[in-house]
Amino acid sequence: MKSSGKHIHKALSFLLAVTMITGLLFISGCGNDMPAADGNDTDAPYKTAAEEFFLDRGDGTYTLTEAVYPKDYDGPMPLVAIAHGFKGTLNSGGAEELSHRLAEAGYAAVRMDFNPSIAPKKNADKTNLYDLKSMEADMLRAVNYMIGHHSIDTDRLGLYARSMGGGVAMTMANENSGGFDFKAVALVAPAGTDDAMVYYMGGDESWEEMKKTAREDGFIEHQGQKLTPEWFKEFEDYNPCDFGYKFADKPVLVICNTLDYVVTDETSRKCAAAYKNSRVIEVTTDNYHGYEMSYENSELKDYLMSELIDFFKDNL
């Protein structure tokens, strides 16, 4: 009987051990079967899609535009409209890479080439004629296109711009351009003061001489761009820094470079100071006006783009 009791005890111990192991295996297996978190709450990057198209400007010219957005986004997407600067293109300053990074983070991005094409074809000639007002109009056409063709959350619209485009973005934010309530603005080297472009053109005397030629000849060509009398007038008629108060306490991020001599860090800081709720990131790089953002590999680029993504995550 004693021997039988020992066997029973061993059998019970074995069954208990098996039961415990089975239970542990079951619990471990259940971990993989838990419901996934909502797709918009995960930190995993979205797969992205890109769409290239031309926007009709209504005057026989067209704006080359590209939208990049997250695939399979659940619900209306936040949107960031992107503006380049003087002489730039839709891919200037790393804008293409930034667009894809935004889309991976769950944000639609739309950017355009402000230099109009004479036909809706990529190899079509350019007019080399654009100014602040036409840039603003292009931005609004792009935003409205996105709203009309994609599911966009119009309560989560942001602006990103650099250099001359920075002044355009400041104006749009200040004035609720197009009736939109832009929620956040990020600027790299914004030419948004009353003297930023005067400085870029060589100072007051050079500015006045260029204006005179534009009046007499209809335009003056500078660095491949045709500057009309209206081009000069628009800079003189509206100083975005004077109206930053209209943006109230909505957030503005300004990035400047101590070695930038195209748009100086002093100019960038003046733009930041025009807003109640602004933050400045100051860098130092020999890539004076590019900020290394178009480099294939750059720690500075990665840092700045991460800061930009985080800024829009926090504020859109």
Annotated model-derived regions:
Residues 287-301:
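Catalytic histidine-centered segment of alpha/beta-hydrolase-like enzymes
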Residues 247-248, 253-256:
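Short beta-strand/loop motif that positions the catalytic acidic residue
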Residues 38-74:
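N-terminal cap/lid segment of alpha/beta-hydrolase-fold proteins
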Residues 127-150:
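Alpha/beta-hydrolase active-site loop
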Residues 172-227:
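Hydrolase active-site cap/lid region
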Residues 87-99, 114, 266:
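The serine-hydrolase catalytic nucleophile loop
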Residues 261-267:
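Conserved alpha/beta-hydrolase "acid-adjacent" motif
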Residues 99-122:
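Conserved alpha/beta-hydrolase
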